[in-house]
């Protein structure tokens, strides 16, 4: 009987605090993903923060999303000790897009998130040209981030919103 107590308690705790647990899991996912890409010195940096932050803004609101973006966008850059200027500055367009589309994200997530992701990629390409990044980073990375974001918005975001 005592072996059933811990799993039941964990399930009840998850059901009571699932919004908090999901937020912490998303922060951990974004930070570990970013840290891994920096420590492996990958040439193409597929950032999942733009569309995860759009989901957090739609589900938790802008007051939770702003610290989420700042923590999960900047901390892995310093933790890895290897950061590029464009990756460091990409937090600014992410914040701008989330602030600009915060009201619409809460009412209609999917169409607004698709458009907001395209706006973010446009400003990220401008940022890549301003910071004089490599050619493959200017061309391949925005396309890959857009496709990955569309897949996230289309398939994974509905599953996550079911948990919240």
Short names for language-model regions:
Residues 30-31, 73, 121:
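Residue-level recognition of pore/gate-forming positions within transmembrane alpha-helices
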